[in-house]
């Protein structure tokens, strides 16, 4: 009720020209009131057009001197500006300024207005339409914009998820690299510690040998000096004594003097000493990385028992050893032991058949004085020969192996020469530390077989290249005559 009264009052104090609340209101004799600025502008226009002034509402002429300020209306307008309409009066479908229904849409200003707003100076000359006419058009536009934004939101969420995934991946990768770096440098420190200890032991041994030799030389020189001193004293005594003393046994003295030979002591020139060379750290790191890389392909290898091999296999199929010696009784009951004939049957294959890919395994050969291990293309009965002479261990017969004899001689077996086809070409391997554990890496596609000395920090022992794998290949073990077992290591060992 109060809101309706306020709306009616507002209509009474609205300028008919600008349709706004009266500002500095002026009243004419006819009773109509206008803003001072609006009435002044209208007066000037009327005088130019007609030569007289008339009320813009009722067209009754007036004299400028009869215009008077309307203080009463000005006070009402001032009070009205201070009063806000109640929520009921401020309906969303009514103009907040004029109280009229919002039925029009101004295209230039993008606003919903009432018919009084349309006639005001603010919207004069603008393109206006009924709200019902433009609502559907803008609804379609807003729906399209909404769908586009939802699609952008989905893309943003997917990109956000990708970034989180990439962030987690990078974190995992860098953590993995950190772990590898720590492991590599820990190994490097172990090698440096070992090299330092080994070098110090060599120096201590060198010091012991040299000082012992020099001590012996010193003792000999002391003895020689004492003998010379005694001989000199004898000669001086003879020369200072009587004729009888001079001639008594003179020939023996002269002979002793002539036979004096000064034995020079053994010396050790410092310029001929072995010069210490610091280890190649870059090369060591490359070795670590190569071994770390191939160990990613570690497979769990076990042996496959068969009826033709005389090798002894453990229950878990990881240990292979030579058979125990047999007791033989000779003539007159003489008792002695001998091994069975180590022919082709002594070798044993791994159970894994390899036809592609990269494969790595390790064999523990600690405390063994003889062994052969590597890769074999399978047993070939038509190529059986005396393994005791190593005749069959050649790549052309399907063997890519290395071996140890007499506890120190490490060799690789290559193809024989044209002149001696039955004898493999033995390649002596320079191994500083005899391996207690050997790593074998087979790259089927690259046609290579590599052997690593795990005991000596993973240094490469030997590598077969250009291997011809025409059929499936298997891990190969031969314990030879040494009774100590050779063991296939598990990846977790």
UniProtKB/Swiss-Prot annotation:
It is found in: Cytoplasm; Nucleus. GO terms for biological process: activation of innate immune response; autophagy; defense response to virus; host-mediated suppression of symbiont invasion; innate immune response; positive regulation of canonical NF-kappaB signal transduction; positive regulation of DNA-binding transcription factor activity; positive regulation of MAPK cascade. Residues 185-198 are annotated as: Required for interaction with GABARAP and for autophagy. It is an enzyme of class 2 (transferase). It catalyses: S-ubiquitinyl-[E2 ubiquitin-conjugating enzyme]-L-cysteine + [acceptor protein]-L-lysine = [E2 ubiquitin-conjugating enzyme]-L-cysteine + N(6)-ubiquitinyl-[acceptor protein]-L-lysine. Degraded in a proteasome-independent fashion in the absence of viral infection but in a proteasome-dependent fashion following exposure to restriction sensitive virus. Transmembrane segments: none annotated. The modification N-acetylalanine is found at residue 2. GO terms for cellular component: cytoplasm; cytosol; nucleus; P-body. Residues 281-493 form the B30.2/SPRY domain. Keywords: Acetylation, Antiviral defense, Autophagy, Coiled coil, Cytoplasm, Host-virus interaction, Immunity, Innate immunity, Metal-binding, Nucleus, Phosphoprotein, Transferase, Ubl conjugation, Ubl conjugation pathway, Zinc, Zinc-finger. InterPro entries: B30.2/SPRY, B30.2/SPRY_sf, Butyrophylin_SPRY, ConA-like_dom_sf, SPRY_dom, TRIM/RBCC, Znf-RING_euk, Znf_B-box. Its EC number is 2.3.2.27. Zn(2+) binds at residues 95, 98, 117, 123. A zinc finger (B box-type) spans 90-132. The modification Phosphoserine is found at residue 86. A zinc finger (RING-type) spans 15-59. Pathway: Protein modification; protein ubiquitination. Residues 130-241 form a coiled coil. One of its GO terms (molecular function) is protein-macromolecule adaptor activity. Capsid-specific restriction factor that prevents infection from non-host-adapted retroviruses. Blocks viral replication early in the life cycle, after viral entry but before reverse transcription. In addition to acting as a capsid-specific restriction factor, also acts as a pattern recognition receptor that activates innate immune signaling in response to the retroviral capsid lattice. The B box-type zinc finger domain and the coiled-coil domain contribute to the higher and low order multimerization respectively which is essential for restriction activity. The coiled coil domain is important for higher order multimerization by promoting the initial dimerization. The B30.2/SPRY domain acts as a capsid recognition domain. Polymorphisms in this domain explain the observed species-specific differences among orthologs. Can form homodimers and homotrimers. In addition to lower-order dimerization, also exhibits a higher-order multimerization and both low- and high-order multimerizations are essential for its restriction activity. Isoform Delta interacts with BTBD1 and BTBD2. Interacts with PSMC4, PSMC5, PSMD7 and HSPA8/HSC70. Interacts (via B30.2/SPRY domain) with HSPA1A/B. Interacts with PSMC2, MAP3K7/TAK1, TAB2 and TAB3. Interacts with SQSTM1. Interacts with TRIM6 and TRIM34. Interacts with ULK1 (phosphorylated form), GABARAP, GABARAPL1, GABARAPL2, MAP1LC3A, MAP1LC3C and BECN1. Belongs to the TRIM/RBCC family. This is Tripartite motif-containing protein 5. It comes from Homo sapiens.
